[in-house]
Amino acid sequence: MMRRFLVSVGGGARDYVESIGLSARTFFTMLGLSPGLLRRPRLLVEQLHVIGNYSLLIIILSGLFVGMVLGLQGYYTLNKYGASESLGLLVALGLTRELGPVITALLFAGRAGTSLTAEIGLMKAGEQLSAMEMMAVNPIQRVLAPRFWAGVISVPLLTAMFSAVGILGGYLIGVELIGVDEGAFWSQMQGGVDVWKDVFNGFVKSVVFGIAITFIALYQGYEAQPTPEDVSGATTRTVVISSLMIWWLDFMLTALMFSK
């Protein structure tokens, strides 16, 4: 009984360490082959167009409604203390520091991330990746690397769009609907938001999230078994692992950036 338990625990630990090693090898192999994209920039541009369009509409709509809700809730909270003029600052800080990068990353994982996993998994199931290897074409360089860098570039751009649309939503609710002074709304935002501490740190978060989400999505599809069931399971794992990774990374980055 004890021997069976130890074998089970040891086997699980071995598989976990092995998966970390395989993912690290795939990641660094992909980074090493990435300079080859300079000879084929069209691959990167095509993937930027596809991956960006996957999430564009949902990012815009979500950013608008999140900004409107933040403006509404923020006004009722600040108004209790006679500080409703600071609504613009509250909306801008909430979006640039936290809500923009985190919600964009979660939406990207659920929309573009699952699409990437399914695409790579189906290519593997259809033996397209094996055919590339037989023709002396490295699938990591030709398939994974362009999609990886497209995802890394797309997430910060989508985050900026989410935050901008969210600020617009907060403005529509706070100024146009409730009647907060427009000058105070923008001046408080301009005076209180620090470019390096707030905007740049939010940008760094979005880049880190983009790296993590895109690689998780690609790796899950690349390592999935060539069966419809396992490809479906890989898309589910992409969402679960990416979501947990986003929250963990957000906590760690927030602790490093804003602890002082």
Locations of regions flagged by a protein language model:
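Start (N-cap) of specific transmembrane helices in multi-pass transporter permeases
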Residues: 138-159, 234, 238
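Short cytoplasmic-facing helical segments at TM-TM junctions of multi-pass membrane proteins
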Residues: 120-145, 228-231
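Final/C-terminal transmembrane alpha-helix of multipass membrane proteins
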Residues: 231, 237-254
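Short, membrane-interfacial amphipathic segments enriched in basic
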Residues: 2-42, 221, 225
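Hydrophobic alpha-helical transmembrane segments of multi-pass membrane transport proteins
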Residues: 87-130, 216
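Active-site cofactor/substrate anionic-group-binding motifs, chiefly glycine-
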Residues: 49-103, 107
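Membrane-interfacial helix-loop-helix connectors in multipass membrane proteins
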Residues: 73-96, 164-207, 211, 215-235, ...
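Membrane-interface helix starts
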Residues: 36-61, 240
